[in-house]
């Protein structure tokens, strides 16, 4: 086993901040396990292909908005997919569908399945985390669109609703799975 921990590249795409919170939580857990791992915002800068190939593992936490992962996450995955020898990918989709039983897995979550298929990915680990619902924080248009989606899917529609659906235990489990993969990648 190497004394030097393998490098993990952790990126996120967020609109309302929940994916950032999840990525920062992952960063803290992975840092506690051995090496400082910053969570980098894809809206600020997209990594170069060389940044990705230098990593032992790449982690992406990507929010879904109106049925699609954010454009910066799609751009990131296009670069990742173009690599000749990409490092293992740990993928987390953040969406409100994952609040329902059976919808937090790569097979059970339609958005996660779609992004994996669209980019022809083979992630080492893939999960969906439920995000948060915060109607008062949304602008008028977003509030009405999201309320309509919630009406269709049986979710809360009261415009004063603020609910965090994220299971932090599930995020910790994902961090543990990523940490185990990184330790294996660092083995001779």
What is the predicted function of each stretch?
Residues 13-17, 42, 63-67:
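Short, surface-exposed acidic/glycine-rich loop or hinge patches that mediate macromolecular interfaces
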Residues 2-31:
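N-terminal beta1-alpha1 ligand-phosphate binding loop
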Residues 3-5, 62-188:
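FMN-binding flavodoxin-like domain, especially the glycine-rich phosphate-binding loop
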Residues 11, 40, 92:
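The conserved SAM/SAH-binding core of class I Rossmann-like methyltransferase domains
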Residues 52-53, 84:
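A short, aliphatic-rich alpha-helical micro-motif
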Residues 33-46:
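A short beta-strand-loop structural module common to alpha/beta enzyme folds
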């Amino acid at each position: 086993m190497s004394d030097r921990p393998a490098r993990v590249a952790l990126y996120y795409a967020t609109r309302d901040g929940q994916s950032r919170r999840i990525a920062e939580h992952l960063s803290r857990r992975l840092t506690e396990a051995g090496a400082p791992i910053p969570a980098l915002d894809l809206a600020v800068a997209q990594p170069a292909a060389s940044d990705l190939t230098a990593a032992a593992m790449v982690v992406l936490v990507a929010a879904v908005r109106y049925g699609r992962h954010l454009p910066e996450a799609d751009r990131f995955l296009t670069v990742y997919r173009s690599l000749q020898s990409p490092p293992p990918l740990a993928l987390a989709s953040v969406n409100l569908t994952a609040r329902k039983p059976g919808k937090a897995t790569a097979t059970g979550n339609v958005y996660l399945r779609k992004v994996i298929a669209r980019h022809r990915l083979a992630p080492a680990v893939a999960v969906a985390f439920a995000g948060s619902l915060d109607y008062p924080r949304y602008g008028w248009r977003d509030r009405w669109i999201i309320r309509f989606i919630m009406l269709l899917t049986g979710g809360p529609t009261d415009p004063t609703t603020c609910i965090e659906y994220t299971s932090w235990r599930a995020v910790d489990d994902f961090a543990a799975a990523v940490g185990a993969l990184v330790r294996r990648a660092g083995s001779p």
